[in-house]
């Protein structure tokens, strides 16, 4: 989803930031980089998979590849320039075809971050990370492919479009489906 000027994309993050995340302001920077997905892809996923879900907190945790006992409470949609977005994967260009291979990584800050995130994801936490640019859906369903994931290293260029508590976000998605 692009803004009217065609310069920014609308991404979505699920979080527990203390900041109220008011529309018009930047996404808070206290949590480090922003892990996000496409609002358009989330909306399409909801249209196809919403039936039968009784615990949305758990289902979103599974879909987005985060622990089921996390404290995620709100979804925030935000505008950002594609130039400020990378793919948290072997190849960082979010517009290029994804290729699998550690050898693609060049020495430097991103490779250092990548290596630290592997250690953190697989040895220090319960956050599965595919390293392929998509979330790991651990629901046990038909596919382990969740949604395309993006990383915004610096929130300074973001502009919040909306913030909804998880239950209200589900209602918002339902309204979008009824409008379609």
Spans of model-derived segments:
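Surface-exposed beta-strand edges and their flanking turn/coil or helix-capping segments
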Residues: 24-26, 49-52, 90-93
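Solvent-exposed loop/turn segments at secondary-structure junctions
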Residues: 17, 41-42, 83-86
